[in-house]
């Protein structure tokens, strides 16, 4: 195999190895070449990554090589890490979010009546993820806080407007809002 193909395979092996990394001896065994040849190819690849506008570099930690992101782009990677995802929310938070999405503006007490359990922790989580916010105060004793969804909610779930939420049909009116919401998300992701 030529050097170009060898470097392509090494690149793939580094990717497959992930954060664990891979020993040059392992690469040499896979490629059926000497370790020195692997080290030379990796060195060339490191220089190529340094000299170009690439987001990745090849680093060596504790005798293994792996891909790592470049420090100069760290602020962008942090934005991705800080972006909330549905996968990072608990079942209780997702159920509460579904209720808010379909019934907004809604008070905490109304949410608890629908769910049948307290929603304090779920509300805190959703507010901290910027998926819901206070939208005002309800009339009545104590003037309870009203909650509604945010732009981040729309972005996170790939919606342009709340009108993109599937409508509640007559047969679905008896369904739990959370079940309907999860079904709706599955439809949106197809």
From Swiss-Prot:
Chief location: cytoplasm
One GO cellular component term: cytoplasm
GO biological process, one term: cell division
Compartments where located: Cytoplasm
UniProt keyword annotations, A-Z: Cell cycle, Cell division, Chromosome partition, Cytoplasm
SUPFAM superfamilies, alphabetized: Winged helix' DNA-binding domain (SSF46785)
Function noted in UniProt: Participates in chromosomal partition during cell division. May act via the formation of a condensin-like complex containing Smc and ScpA that pull DNA away from mid-cell into both cell halves.
HAMAP family: ScpB (MF_01804)
PANTHER family named in the record: SEGREGATION AND CONDENSATION PROTEIN B
Subunit structure: Homodimer. Homodimerization may be required to stabilize the binding of ScpA to the Smc head domains. Component of a cohesin-like complex composed of ScpA, ScpB and the Smc homodimer, in which ScpA and ScpB bind to the head domain of Smc. The presence of the three proteins is required for the association of the complex with DNA.
Similarity comment: family membership: Belongs to the ScpB family.
UniProt protein name: Segregation and condensation protein B
Organism per entry: Bacillus mycoides (strain KBAB4)
Species lineage: Bacteria, Bacillati, Bacillota, Bacilli, Bacillales
Gene of this entry: scpB
């Amino acid at each position: 195999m030529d050097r170009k193909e060898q470097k392509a395979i090494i690149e793939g092996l580094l990717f497959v190895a992930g954060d664990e990394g891979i020993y040059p001896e392992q690469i040499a065994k896979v490629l059926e070449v000497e370790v020195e040849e692997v080290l030379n190819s990796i060195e060339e690849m490191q220089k190529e990554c340094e000299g170009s506008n690439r987001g990745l570099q090849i680093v060596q930690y504790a005798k293994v090589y792996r891909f790592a992101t470049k420090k100069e782009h760290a602020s962008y990677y942090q934005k991705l890490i800080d972006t909330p995802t549905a996968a990072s929310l608990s079942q209780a938070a997702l159920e509460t979010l579904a209720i808010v999405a379909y019934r907004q503006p809604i008070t905490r007490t109304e949410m608890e009546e629908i769910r049948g359990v307290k929603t304090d922790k779920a509300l805190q989580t959703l507010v901290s993820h910027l998926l819901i916010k206070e939208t005002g105060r309800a009339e009545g004793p104590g003037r309870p806080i009203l909650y509604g969804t945010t732009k981040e909610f729309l972005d996170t779930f790939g919606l342009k407007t709340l009108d993109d939420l599937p409508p509640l049909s007559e047969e679905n009116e008896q369904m739990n809002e959370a079940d309907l919401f999860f079904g709706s998300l599955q439809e949106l992701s197809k």
